Amino acid sequence: VHVGPCDQVCSRIDPEKDECCRAHGYRGHSSCYYGRMECY
């Protein structure tokens, strides 16, 4: 699922990506495609 507010952390370390996804109600991040954060 694309989570727009997390796009800005795509260049940061994985734990920060997971933290952003969790803050939006997801379990963690799966990947960043072209600057778009994908959470699951």
UniProtKB/Swiss-Prot annotation:
Keywords: Antibiotic, Antimicrobial, Disulfide bond, Fungicide, Immunity, Innate immunity, Secreted
Gene Ontology CC: one annotated term: extracellular region
A Pfam family recorded for this sequence: Antimicrobial_6
UniProt-listed Gene3D superfamilies: Diapause-specific peptide
Keyword flag Lipoprotein: no
Signal peptide: none
Main location: secreted
Protein family per UniProt: Belongs to the diapausin family.
Disulfide bonds: C6-C20, C10-C32, C21-C39
InterPro entries per record: Diapausin_sf
Domain of life: Eukaryota
Transmembrane domains' residue ranges: none
Biological processes annotated in GO: defense response to bacterium; defense response to fungus; innate immune response; killing of cells of another organism
Protein's UniProt name: Spodomicin
Known partners and oligomeric status: Monomer.
Tissues where this protein is expressed: Hemolymph.
Induction, per UniProt: By bacterial infection.
Subcellular compartments: Secreted
Keyword Secreted attributed: yes
Function in brief: Fungicide.
Post-translational modification: Contains three disulfide bonds.
